[in-house]
From Swiss-Prot:
Residues 133-328, 679-876 form the ATP-grasp domain. Mg(2+) 3 binds at Q830, E847. Its cofactor is Mg(2+); Mn(2+). Binds 4 Mg(2+) or Mn(2+) ions per subunit. Disulfide bonds: none annotated. The gene is carB. This is Carbamoyl phosphate synthase large chain. Composed of two chains; the small (or glutamine) chain promotes the hydrolysis of glutamine to ammonia, which is used by the large (or ammonia) chain to synthesize carbamoyl phosphate. Tetramer of heterodimers (alpha,beta)4. The lineage of its organism: Bacteria, Pseudomonadati, Pseudomonadota, Gammaproteobacteria, Lysobacterales.
Amino acid sequence: MPKRTDLRTILIIGAGPIVIGQACEFDYSGAQACKALRAEGFRVVLVNSNPATIMTDPDMADAVYIEPIHWRTVEKIITKEKPDALLPTMGGQTALNCALDLADHGVLEKYGVELIGAKREAIRMAEDRELFRVAMQEIGLECPKAEVAKSLERALEIQAKVGFPTIIRPSFTLGGTGGGIAYNRQEFEEIIKRGLELSPVHEVLVEESVLGWKEFEMEVVRDASDNCIIVCSIENLDPMGVHTGDSITVAPAQTLSDKEYQRLRDASIAVLRKIGVDTGGSNVQFGIDPQTGRVVVIEMNPRVSRSSALASKATGFPIAKIAAKLAVGYTLDELKNEITGGKTPASFEPSIDYVVTKIPRFAFEKFPQADARLTTQMKSVGEVMAMGRTFAESLQKAVRGLETGKVGLEPTGLDLSSEDDLVVLKRELKAPGAERLFYVADAFRAGFAVADVYALSYIDPWFLDQIEEIVAAEGRLVTDGLGSIDGARLRQLKRIGFSDARIAQLTGTNEVAVRTLRRVLKVKPVYKRVDSCAGEFATGTAYLYSTYEEECEAAPSDRRKIMILGGGPNRIGQGIEFDYCCVHAALALREDGFETIMVNCNPETVSTDYDTSDRLYFEPLTLEDVLEIVEVEHPVGVIVQYGGQTPLKLAKALEANGVPVIGTSPESIDLAEDRERFQRLVQQLGLRQPPNCTARTADEALVLAREIGYPLVVRPSYVLGGRAMEIVYSEADLARYVRDAVKVSNDSPVLLDRFLDNAVEVDVDIIADPEGQVLIGGVMEHIEEAGVHSGDSSCSLPPYSLSAATQDDLRRQVIRLAQALNVIGLMNTQFAIQSNDDGSDIVYLLEVNPRASRTVPFVSKATGVPLAKIAARCMTGKTLAEQSVTCEVVPAYYAVKEAIFPFAKLQGVDPILGPEMRSTGEVMGVGRSFAAAFARAQEAGDIRAPQPGRAFVSVRDPDKKRVLPVVLALVERGFGVVATAGTYAWLQQNGVACEVVNKVAEGRPHIVDLIKNGEIVYIINTTEGRAAIADSFSIRREALQHCVTYSTTIAGAKALVNSLEFRGTGPVWSLQELHKELQV
């Protein structure tokens, strides 16, 4: 049936900020849906609160709203834009929940908006655990034994029937939030209470354990005529009990017999028919008991998901694009498969002749207090995917793509001859953590048999055999040495995925020696195309991966090419913002007539969509892999400054190998990152830095620290995201840090800076062109004080409290720095501003990054100036004048960026902010005043507005004076105040009526008791020094558990309290309307 003609305007809801469980895969699906529907002539309206996405670019939809994804806000957009239909399946759990809210509150009916892609009943049946279970019984499919509970008492009754261990799954949450595995009653009660609190409908499923079973997923697409295809089968290497987002997964499934595969295929299609997913993609998860073959249905997602992004990238079949077209009436046989150049219809099931492995990326190093065991609640922050002709090849490529410093299945560091360490090894095999794969390899080194490892880990023996073979090959290499390797043996090693760097490690040589040998022996990779049909039809799409075979399918052109190196897997400190910049570079340079080549290995992103660039190499971002691609393609320029630290780390080595790195030179990048060289430059320019020094030994650090004075910010050199950075208040603190952190520094020195207390931090983004002209992109004033990592601080553009004179001073300093560093392209500079008693400001330069920064997308959305595109053109030789962009744009409205944190997912983590970055994503709010914009950003970040009740205040001495006006504003709004003794005395002295409450150490009833009893609605708590931070940890943690809004900085508290009156008020503006104001 052809497309519907009764629909004109379609509303798409995005997924909001990047959080654990919902990352940039929804930017990829949403961007695809926008493109597909506009190409069909529909008017598209988009709402998403995340400014770092490609889908919120003003040219992606006819009207783009960067607004909170809340049904009341979306209702305002519906009233204004009058859409005919709403497509809720492209924005993950967030969009589905919002669509259900709109339906339940009668909004869709009131405005005559039709849900397309998934009907309300289908969403309800798939997401409501009890309805789903009943539906499965009706079609003769089994689910694990389970019942739904809405209270702890009921949950305990069900638990008695299903026994321990028990799986707990809250309804309508994302990435298993609030769920877990309980092995005893105490754990069970804790997880149930948390799950009931975090489920929006306050219900949980209490389920029998299927731990250790094999887990499979089917990606299914169905159209309105009931045509169904399986796009891809996915097998989890980790057995049931680990969330599929945290599992290593492999496509296609490797250990299913044909009969079992057909059985799962039939079952998954039956599930879609029963649930009523009429059009679009869904993901169905199964568990199989390896002993009996019993099959159970675990769950299904009636929308595109993380797995469908993986399946799309693994097969080249664009699920989201096809799903969007099916939602408007097309059938699969009417749509063409673009990868085969339209030679096959979309109803032709993809088949692949290679193996794809996905490995998740974790961030436990950022959260040492978090429980690092993997369960049914997702904890990974990103993922990497690799392709190879064998499982071993794709596994080892994925390992080096993870960028955790490992170049293969390296030993974990256990002493395998020690009994104590073998106990640790067995525990690590049994209780999965982020590194289990490496412990499996260690088990084989320790002489374990496959059966022994299986008995502990329940990883299928087929996978274990492959890992054992890799370890055996390593052992032979260690014995024989590099000299014994001939061409045939080297080719065999490369075919099972060994990197040059790993071969060098095992043979005691270096990577250059191995590469030289490989060149002499003429062992080079070839590139194969992803074509969705296992080579049955020719493909014009250049979507490539490397392997060691005979025939190369790369067929490079002789056009002028620019290669863009992506950012690799998402992690804290390096996320979607960098992918956004890479995509913009590809789009701009393609428009300029260059052939664009993207190199990346992150399956979630828009950059790895095969039609973002002319040629896509799905490869790890290591020196070896990049050099091989350069050798085939011969680009005229390679861009390293857009993918964050990942490609920057390669800049010098690429240049040394004759690769044309364009933009700011690796020499200038090094000058900005090398502390001592940079300090000399700052002194030459007559700019001011906080007193600082560099220490190469622990003793030297303690001596120099006495000269600078405490408090200090200490960190290793060369880091991104503030890794291992800390504020220390005493010599004892510094001694402990130097003991622990010098390990991080790999013989590179420790940096000490005087910490500027109560300073305002400012970020400035600029572009410099080849002639040294500079365009100020934006000046952003941070809301949290200096000392909170810039990626974790909210910020406002334009600044809300800085004087015009200070802002002009910042602009002057930035221009001088850019010119002195010979920057071509983007540069980000951070300043701290301290006020003197006479009201004048002192400006301190904190750091300069001559690369894309994480604020680029936010600034671009706020000002309407596409910084990443303009800067990419500067790198290829165009001036700012030639691009007609020479004036800074300062909007008349305010835009506020707010950071989003993963604390709810990571039990036991202290949510206090500091110099180490811990946020996973961001949202943006726009308003006519700073307070209104801040209120909108808080709504978008789902930060509850405290309603009048009792506010708890406990602040460090230097903050007492500054907290007074905030407390007075709270009292004026009808809040009561409780405070700890010191703060209580200060408030009483200043005429504020309040009650005193015990600190936790002072006896009961104390403040945590009040929080647990629901008596506190808002918390202001600032601390300094390790002891005070540790003492007040339980306050912040309980606030998080009980969803009490809290502020850990005075500036944050002031902004929040002043914004309360603007919550839920004001009109909505599309980006197009806002940007039109700027052009006047």
